[in-house]
Amino acid sequence: MGSLWSKISQLFVDAFTEFLVSVVDIAIFLAILFGFTVAGWLLVFLLRVVCSALLRSRSAIHSPELSKVL
């Protein structure tokens, strides 16, 4: 009977261990997903800053031509 109880207790320990491993795996996956999301936001922000700076520098160069058109 002792062997049966030890097998049952070992089964519960293994199941709980697998549960903890799956929780940690999900947390790691969500952290990676959040990291990619933040990296995407940063990339879009930098792209908008660069494009805005380029457009502002071009409009400053061609401002006399633009004033003739306007």
UniProtKB/Swiss-Prot annotation:
GO terms for cellular component: extracellular region; host cell endoplasmic reticulum membrane; host cell Golgi membrane; membrane; viral envelope; virion membrane. A lipid is attached at residue 2 (N-myristoyl glycine). Its main location: virion. Residues 2-15 are annotated as: Endoplasmic reticulum retention signal. Pfam families: PRRSV_2b. The keyword DNA-binding does not apply. The chain crosses the membrane at residues 26-46. It comes from the Viruses. The keyword Transmembrane helix applies. Residues 47-70 are intravirion. It is found in: Virion membrane; Host endoplasmic reticulum membrane; Host Golgi apparatus membrane; Secreted. GO terms for biological process: monoatomic ion transmembrane transport. Residues 2-25 are virion surface. Keywords: Glycoprotein, Host endoplasmic reticulum, Host Golgi apparatus, Host membrane, Ion channel, Ion transport, Lipoprotein, Membrane, Myristate, Secreted, Transmembrane, Transmembrane helix, Transport, Viral envelope protein, Viral ion channel, Virion. Myristoylated. Not glycosylated. GO terms for molecular function: channel activity. It is a single-pass type I membrane protein. Belongs to the arteriviridae E protein family. Homooligomer. Associates with itself into higher-order structures, including dimers, trimers and tetramers. Associates with the GP2a-GP3-GP4 complex. Minor envelope protein. May function as a viroporin in the virion envelope that facilitates uncoating of the virus in order to release the genomic RNA into the cytoplasm for subsequent replication. This is Envelope small membrane protein. It comes from Porcine reproductive and respiratory syndrome virus (strain Lelystad). The gene is GP2b.
